[in-house]
Amino acid sequence: MISALQPISINFGTDGFRGIIGDNFTFDAVSRISSSLAEYLKDSPSNTVAVGYDTRVLSKEFAAAAAAALVSSGIKVVLSDNFCPSPVLSYFVKDKKCAAGVMITASHNPYMFNGLKFKSPFGSSMLESEVKKIEKIVNASDFSKKNKGKSRYIGRTGLDYSDNNNFRYADFKKDYIRRIIDLTELDKAVSGADKDLLKSLEVVIDPMFGAGIGYLSSVLKRFSIKHGSINNAVNPAFPGLNPEPIDSNLHKLKSSLKKKGIKNKFAVGFATDGDADRIGAVDCEGNFIDSHKIFSIILDYLIKEGRSGSVVKTVSVSKSIDDICKKHNIGLYEVPIGFKNIAALMTKDGNDVFMGGEESGGIGIASHLPERDGIFNALLLLKIIIKSGKNLNELLNGIFNEPYPYSYAREDLHLDEGRKLRLIEKLKSGSFDIPFKNNLAYSNFIDGFKFGYKDGSWLLIRPSGTEPLLRIYAESKAKNKTDGLINKVKTEINAL
C-alpha cells in the first residue's frame, strides 16, 4: 500500500520534477503529482493520459503508481507495456490525441535520480504556465485531505484498484517506428544509394543502458544496414558512465569507432541518453561530434531541401547556428534553456519555426514532433550521409568551407548554496569581474548571465535548473581563448 499523502512541497525544475530515489522522489510524490495532473485535466476535452517509463530503478513501479493515481481520479490511462523513450511517449500522446502524457525518467542524470515530466497534447513538453498551475494544485494546503483515502495498490506485475479499473496497456513502439521510417524516407535513401557506400556503411549504437535499447537497431536491421551495439542491456546502475551523450561519457563508443575508422570512412556512432531524447555522435576517427555540429548538419540539410521559416535555439547553443541562419536569410529566436521554451514557439499559433535545438543534445523537427528525439535525429543523420555520400566531417567542412570554426566548452562546478547565492548577487549587481570587459559587445540575461564579445566569442554563467550545479559555457574561434574565458571565471568564483 502507498502511505498517506504527505504535504511536502514539490517544485518543478527546467524539465519536470526530479529527485533522489527514496529521498524526495517517492511513490507518495508521484501519486500526488499525478492526482494533481488529473485535477488540472478535469475540464479537458480528452480524458486519456498516456504513461511511459525508462530503464531506471523502480521506473516501472513509479509508472504504475502514476497510472493508479490517475485512474483513481477518474482519468483513463494507457500504460506502455515496456520501457520506452520519451519521444516515443510524446508521439503516442500526439497520435492518439491524449490529454497529456506522464514520463517517468530522470533523463541524463546519474543512477540515483528519477523524475517525472509532463507531455502536452502536441507531443511536446508541457508549457511552463501549465506546469506552474499543476505545481500550485499539488502544493495546495487542502490537497492532501481531498485525496486521502483513495486506495492504490502498486504491483510489480500490474495494477489493481479498489475504485475502478479504467486503464489498458499498449505497445508504443510499433507506430513510432513506422512514423520515423516514413518521415525520414530512409527506404528511398537506401534504395537510391551508391552500392559501395552501403557496403561500407557501419553504425555503432550506444543507448547508454537506457530506454533507447532496441530502437535504432530494429530500424537498421530492417534495411540490412550493418550495425552493432554497446551498453545495450538494461542496467539501472549505468555502470561506468552517466547516461548523457557527451564526450567524457563515450569512451567505449569512441574506441570502437576509432578501430573501425582505420579501414572505413563511413563508420559512424550514435549515442542516446537515458530516455533517448538527446543525441551524441562519433565520427569514423573516434572523435566526438557534439550537438552543435549535429544541429548544424541537420539545419543545413533541411534548408537545402527547401525548408523555410524560422529556427529557435537556447542561449547556450553555438554561434554556428547564427551563421547558417544568416547565410540563408532564416529567422532565429534565442530562448532560455529547456526544450519546453523551444516547444512553446514551435506550437504557437501562426509561428513558422521548423527546427529547434539546445546544447545538451536535444533537437526537434516540427514536421515530426515539437520535441527532442535522439532516435529520429540519428536516422536523419544517417539518411543525410547516405544521400550525400559524405561522412560527418565532410558534411561539416562543406557547410563552413573549412573545418568547423568554433571551439566550445562547458564546465560544471559544484558550489554550496552560499557561494552560489553570493555569485549570483555579484553578477546581478555588476560587481563580478567579467573577463575582457572592455571588449564586450552585448549582455543577455534571459537565462543566466551571458556576455558577448566584439570578435563573436561569448560567455554564459548559469545555475542548473535540474542539478545542484553552476554551469559555465564559453565559445570562440580559438581553444585557448575559450579555455581562458572559463578559467578566468573559475578564478573569480574561487575567490568568493
Residue ranges and their predicted role:
Residues 15, 51, 89, 102, ...:
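Buried hydrophobic positions in well-ordered alpha/beta secondary-structure cores of metabolic enzymes
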Residues 268, 307-496:
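Phosphate-binding and adjacent anionic-ligand microenvironments
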Residues 81, 133-177, 284-357, 363-365:
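Proline/glycine-rich low-complexity loops and linkers
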Residues 39, 48-113, 218-282:
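N-terminal small/polar loop signature for handling phosphorylated ligands or for N-terminal nucleophile
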Residues 52-55, 205-207, 283, 367, ...:
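Short glycine-centered, acidic/aromatic-flanked micro-motifs in structured strand/loop junctions
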Residues 99-113, 257-283, 288, 332-334, ...:
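Glycine-rich phosphate-binding loop
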Residues 2-7, 114-262:
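Gly/Ser/Thr-enriched, mixed-charge loops and adjacent short helices
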Residues 1-73, 99-100, 160-203:
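An N-terminal, well-structured beta->alpha segment
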